[in-house]
């Protein structure tokens, strides 16, 4: 079975709120949010701006990343967004070989 590459993303609403989510297709999910579908907390909060995205690898890893980011304070999330890809190790989120676009080592 082929597994999809999962991504962590953060969206900023017009009021400045940061929303954290996961998906296998960031652009499709952003479009869905923009149309009012998806998360109820984003409905009517546009325009929405994608401020962070990173491949995480498998669904299990991205769920852990999402949980960790959702536990951050607003100030910490702002710092996370400011650091972009450098934020991952800073906040204890390790990149897998798969997420970095490399093939996993053969067993």
Swiss-Prot record:
**PROSITE patterns with a match to the protein in the record:** GIY_YIG (PS50164)
Q: Which domain of life is it from?
A: Bacteria
- CDD domains xref list: GIY-YIG_UPF0213 (cd10456)
Which family does the UniProt entry place this protein in?
A: Belongs to the UPF0213 family.
| Gene3D superfamilies with a match to the protein in the record | GIY-YIG endonuclease
HAMAP family recorded: UPF0213
Q: Which residues form the GIY-YIG domain?
A: 4-79
The molecule here is called: UPF0213 protein SG0387
């Amino acid at each position: 079975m082929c597994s999809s590459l999962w991504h962590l993303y953060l969206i900023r609403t017009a009021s400045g709120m940061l929303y954290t989510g996961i998906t296998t297709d960031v652009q499709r999910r952003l479009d869905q949010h923009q149309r009012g579908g998806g998360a109820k907390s984003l409905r009517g909060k546009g325009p929405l701006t994608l401020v962070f995205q990173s491949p995480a690898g498998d669904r299990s890893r991205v769920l852990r990343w999402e949980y960790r980011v959702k536990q951050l304070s607003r100030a910490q999330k702002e710092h996370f967004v400011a650091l972009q890809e450098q934020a991952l190790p800073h906040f204890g989120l390790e990149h897998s070989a798969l997420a970095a676009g490399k093939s996993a080592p053969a067993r």
